[in-house]
Design a protein with these regions (language model features):
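Long, contiguous interaction/recruitment modules in multidomain scaffold/adaptor proteins
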Residues: 128, 138-221, 225-226
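Ankyrin-repeat-protein effector appendages
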Residues: 318-330
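Intrinsically disordered, low-complexity regulatory segments in ankyrin-centric signaling systems
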Residues: 200-265
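Ankyrin-repeat C-terminal turn/loop position
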Residues: 272, 305-306
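A surface-exposed partner-binding patch
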Residues: 1-132, 280
Length: 330
């Protein structure tokens, strides 16, 4: 997206930034040479160019997009709401997260009986509080610049969620990470209250105070947001849904969460597989049970949909005795 000097000034005045088609709000000023030098001194290799490109756009801020991470077959909704920066009011600021990683690296070296040179191989740059973190590999070699995702495991009582700390390689570089950001629901639809993009949309609304130039820029930014909406309906209408993994998963999830048996039938006829994993390791049956869509759950069982080991626990708050007994028998 090409921006005029006047538009860049408006973005700066409203603490907004655009990076690889995504809008950052509460955006911080570009990184200084002094900060780059201080960061580089503690790393095992050079700061990857894509991360520098992001930081030269904004050295921190907030994001309002959906991101899914596949942890060895467990589909996890990853909270990527923060781009860490110095002196932020988050759980830790950037320096705090770097010090946290240094402490962990030193402890690991001591436990393994080896020396550590004090240089980080992986630099934390974003995530959400203490629950999710994104790192970029700074160690020289074929993985230099790759983005790594880490998520904190939750107690077993959180049925269907990650129960152990998990890590995976997510993207080749920071630009690749930003290309994964999307909206699973239309953020402009008033029925999608409390959505992931609510604060982002409020930040765009503030542009209207700048008069016609601000309204025009807001419109351009909204176009960028609309390009990230994952709408499965056109693909269902034109017959291409089965060939679009992310769209068909969202379609199945919405049908299951709404308990829409007619739509489930249409999706099956369109080539969607009821055995496909949608969230965690669960599929359409677990999505129905989690929302208490018991009629749809019974229908799925009638179609031969397999029961997972945690299906009963996922639906425990909604199940009646007959359906619980049926699940136990399968």
């Amino acid at each position: 997206m090409e921006l005029s000097p006047a538009e860049r000034q408006l973005l700066l005045a409203h603490r907004l930034a655009v990076f690889d088609g995504c809008v950052v709000y509460d955006a911080q000023p570009p990184v200084s040479a002094e900060h780059v030098q201080r960061l580089a001194e503690g790393l095992a290799g050079p700061i990857p160019e894509d991360l520098l490109r992001l930081w030269r756009t904004c050295f921190g801020g907030r994001l309002g997009y959906d991101l899914e991470v596949d942890y060895d077959g467990h589909r996890h909704p990853f909270s990527f709401s923060e781009l860490f920066y110095p002196d932020s009011d988050g759980y830790h600021d950037l320096w705090g997260w770097i010090e946290h990683e240094r402490e962990l690296a030193a402890e690991a070296a001591t436990e393994e009986g080896r020396d550590w040179n004090g240089k980080l191989a992986y630099l934390p740059f974003g995530g959400f509080e203490y629950l999710e973190r994104l790192y970029v590999c700074v160690e020289p070699g074929p993985e230099h610049g790759a983005v790594i995702a880490w998520s904190h495991g939750l107690p077993p009582a959180w049925a269907g969620r990650l129960h152990q700390d998990s890590v995976t390689r997510l993207a080749d570089d920071v630009g690749g990470l930003f290309r994964l950001l999307s909206f699973e629901q239309d953020p402009f639809d008033a029925e999608n209250a409390c959505g992931v993009a609510d604060e982002l949309l409020e930040a765009l609304d503030a542009l209207e105070a700048a008069g016609e130039p601000g309204k025009a820029l807001k419109g351009r930014l909204e176009v960028l947001l609309r390009q990230r909406i994952l709408d499965w309906r056109p693909a269902l209408a034109d017959g291409s849904l089965a060939a679009e993994p992310r769209l068909r998963q969202l379609a199945l999830a919405e049908a299951a969460q709404d308990g829409d048996i007619d739509l489930l039938q249409r999706l099956r006829d369109a080539g969607c597989d009821f055995a496909e994993t949608l969230r965690g390791r669960g599929g359409v049956l677990e999505a129905c049970l989690a929302r208490g869509r018991l009629e749809a759950a019974r229908w799925l069982l009638d179609q031969g949909v397999a029961v997972h080991q945690d299906s009963l626990q996922i639906g425990a708050a909604h199940l009646d005795a007959l359906l619980a007994e049926r699940l136990l028998r399968l």
